[in-house]
């Protein structure tokens, strides 16, 4: 099956060619790589088409390009051109991504389309694929399109095409989503997959090898956005004063420079910045505790941190703010915080470290549920069911 994966992927070439600090998504790109890699291993031909959007406005045109450092030799990645001028940026990104999708389809027709979230380029391409190309579309739903990151519904105005996005939810033929809340927004009749995260072979192997050499580390990994709670975590760690333990911080984003200043000359905090995948796996498997101090959401399940699954698979105990209901087996390896206020974070860290709660993990369950073999079977089943559903519905909307 030839698959177009239309997603805001950000590979090495894009990060070098365009200023994307403000909209960088590290975990999202990792998950896209995992999905595309598994589908390729199952003999599907996958192409990633990314808008490569630049949100920092400037009068500069960025030409389309192909990723020169692909994560997989059989998964080509194409980026649309960008023109980040006020009032034009979004329309340009949408139009150029759409034209790139049409061009790739004309050269070699696709059999199925996967879209990642409901940004304008994804909505436009999916609508065209359904109405004009008679192709089934699988919706990968990671972030609730109808509320903001804090779960407030006042953000409905940011849904890219208004009612068209809502209509698209009733037009797709399959869905994989990060939470039951997100899946509930789709029609009950279509094939669905609860897909919280994924565990790669690299993480599985390192986790097994390093199970007995855990260090007194607390690890934060992720994009440095205000909503991630990293500033509160650093403030809490300074107040905690836990001898023999270190806080390790990886990632990159708009707060990176501020965070570097905050941790300067603090021997209890190790700031790694943006690291390679190999180094990140080593850090995750070395830490006894990993932490996800996200801002509290008013709509539980509107997002789910992919890294929680990786943390647990690495054999770490996870401290997190609530992100919607989870399976009991997963929660066995977690400690919840009611919010990410520094005092709350301090209390949670004391509970986990001094009470040795860090010994309680959910490693094996997560590997069994979200390891490569399990996810590969579930993905393949979803694609088969989606194709069958599309045919059974007799949909045909070719222009």
Predicted regions: what is each one?
Residues 258-282, 289:
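Nucleotide-activated donor-binding/catalytic signature segment of Leloir-type glycosyltransferases, i.e.
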Residues 4-6, 209-238, 248:
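Conserved donor-binding/catalytic core segment of Leloir-type glycosyltransferases
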Residues 356-369:
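A short, well-ordered alpha-helix in the C-terminal region of glycosyltransferases
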Residues 1-63, 174, 232-241:
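N-terminal subdomain of nucleotide-sugar transferases
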Residues 33-37, 102, 121-124, 128-132, ...:
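Membrane-proximal helix-turn-helix segments that form the acceptor-binding/catalytic region
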Residues 226-228, 278-282, 288-310, 320-328:
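Nucleotide-sugar-dependent
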């Amino acid at each position: 099956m030839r698959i177009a994966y239309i997603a805001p992927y950000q590979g090495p070439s894009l990060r070098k060619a365009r200023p994307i600090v403000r909209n960088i998504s590290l975990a999202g790109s990792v998950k896209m790589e995992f999905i595309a890699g598994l589908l390729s291993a199952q003999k599907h031909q996958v192409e990633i088409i990314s808008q490569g959007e630049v949100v920092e406005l400037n009068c500069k045109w960025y030409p389309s390009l192909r990723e020169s450092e692909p994560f997989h030799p059989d998964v080509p990645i194409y980026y649309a051109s960008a023109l980040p001028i006020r009032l034009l940026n979004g329309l340009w990104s949408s139009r150029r991504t759409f034209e790139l999708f049409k061009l790739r389809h004309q050269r070699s027709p696709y059999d199925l389309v996967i879209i990642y979230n409901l940004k304008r380029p994804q909505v436009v391409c999916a609508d065209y694929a359904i109405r004009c190309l008679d192709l089934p579309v699988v919706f990968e739903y990671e972030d609730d399109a109808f509320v903001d990151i804090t779960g407030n519904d006042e953000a409905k105005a940011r849904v890219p095409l208004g009612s068209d996005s809502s209509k698209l939810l009733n037009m797709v033929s399959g869905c994989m989503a990060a939470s039951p809340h997100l899946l509930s927004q789709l029609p009950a009749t279509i094939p669905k997959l609860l897909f919280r995260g994924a565990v790669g072979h690299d993480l599985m192997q390192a986790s097994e090898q390093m199970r007995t050499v855990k260090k007194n580390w607390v690890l934060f990994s992720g994009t440095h956005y205000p909503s991630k709670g990293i500033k509160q975590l650093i403030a809490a760690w300074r107040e905690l004063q836990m001898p023999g333990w270190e806080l390790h911080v990886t990632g990159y984003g708009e707060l990176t420079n501020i965070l570097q200043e905050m941790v300067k000359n603090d021997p209890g905090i190790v700031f790694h910045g943006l690291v390679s995948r190999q180094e990140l796996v080593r850090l995750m498997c070395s830490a006894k505790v990993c932490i996800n101090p996200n801002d509290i959401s008013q709509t539980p399940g509107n997002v789910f941190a992919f890294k929680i699954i990786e943390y647990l698979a690495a054999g770490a105990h996870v401290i997190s703010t609530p992100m919607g209901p989870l399976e009991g087996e997963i929660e066995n390896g977690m400690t919840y915080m009611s919010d990410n206020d520094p005092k709350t974070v301090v209390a949670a860290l004391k509970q986990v470290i001094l009470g040795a709660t860090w010994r309680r993990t959910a490693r094996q369950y997560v590997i069994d549920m979200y390891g490569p073999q399990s996810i590969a079977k579930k993905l393949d089943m979803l694609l088969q069911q989606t194709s069958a559903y599309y045919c059974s519905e007799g949909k045909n909307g070719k222009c």
